[in-house]
Amino acid sequence: MNVTLSSDQYNALNELEYWYRKGSHQFIDVSGPIYTGLWDVLQVFLEYAGLDPREVMYLSYDQRTVLDLAYNRYHGYYIYGKLYKYDRNVDLDSIPVINPHSTHLSYTWTKRIRQKIDKRYRLIVVLDASLLNERMLWDLSKYGLPVVLLRDPYLLPDADSYIYTREPNVFLEEPTERMARNPVHTLAYSVLHDKRLTVGSFQSANVIRRKDLHMYNLKSSSMNLVYTQEMRNIINDAYRNTMKRNPIYTYANERVYVADSHYQEILVNTIEKKVKIYLQKGMTGTLTKVNRHAAITRYVPCEFQPDYYHEPFTELVLDRDYLLRRETKSRQLIPDDVVKFEYAYALTPQLARMNHWNDVTIIMEQVQEFDEKLAKLMSYTAITRAARSVTVVI
């Protein structure tokens, strides 16, 4: 791989090589922000280690990243789908045939780790490892393969993330020359290092004042990010109002966020069977079909297409009470499986962690409850969700 490495990257490369050839630990934790070029270091390491790309299994929480890896002939998998199998356990007392007083089928999901993975793999790489918890580390260890954890220390972590109890083995901080030429990465660096954001256009990174924000900015973005749920609700309502959406109805072509996981719903790529898309919490996309309904109807059949995929999930049923943030006394029979959607014309950084979009608009807010460190993590996480361009509103 023809890449000029920085001194930080060389140190990381040496640590990786020593660990792989002589190390006594199964895991190595490599930490670095987006502008330090972790991916480049990893690819040079794999080349030096003599590992064929088909011998490396990549795991990620971001299903668009998984698809990007697959399109580039890497073996990428959605981490929950690859590591676990899911069993639906139905409460027998909830089956109407058995219990005439039951109004709906009740069940829970249990997961169990897959006992085997393809024998061709010699190394596992987890791309967004700061979202892992200790239990998942333990499950990964059961395969007996060396594991590289690529951790972004400034990505908002989960409350049960392993990073609170484990220090990284290798830490990169120096921006690479190539990454420094990326305006989005430069903006992320500025936020972390307390550099004041200056109004102006810097190629694919733009900073504008709040008074200059127009609905055009929001509509032209792949995703809008805000810091609070209150602001998110305001933008979602305003966005629907500009599209002349009656607030009591649900329409096709609306942007939504999946608020709960449905382990049985899987799209299998027709060309490459190993490429699968899972209907999981955190996914965003479009309602491509919504059956006609009355204003009071709660459960409505629909179809949902993820942002980054060409096929929709079909034969779904959405809960309109949850979507519209209301409570009604519905007399409908409750379907066995109901999907909870939220409008997704805007998200918070916490909800956006497992995604990325081409063009992102961020409306920065001063939130009293946020300390300085949390505010930095929120801003950094929001900026790094942009793959191509970002507009920051200050």
Tell where the protein language model's regions lie, with residue ranges.
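Conserved helicase motor core of P-loop NTPases
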Residues: 3-42, 49, 138-139, 143-145, ...
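Conserved P-loop NTPase motor core of helicases/translocases
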Residues: 13-15, 53-138
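Short coil/turn segments at beta-strand junctions that form active-site/ligand-binding loops
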Residues: 24-26, 53-55, 95, 120-122, ...
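Short, basic, glycine/proline-bearing loop/turn elements
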Residues: 28-31, 119-126, 200, 336, ...
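Core RecA-like ATPase module of SF1/SF2 helicases and allied nucleic-acid translocases
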Residues: 36-40, 45, 59-60, 67, ...
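Short glycine-/polar-rich loops that comprise or flank the Walker A/P-loop
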Residues: 53-54, 121, 144-145, 166-171, ...
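Structural recognition of the conserved hydrophobic beta-strand(s) that form the central parallel beta-sheet
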Residues: 58-60, 125-127, 146-152, 392-393
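Conserved Walker B
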Residues: 128-132, 153-154, 352, 367
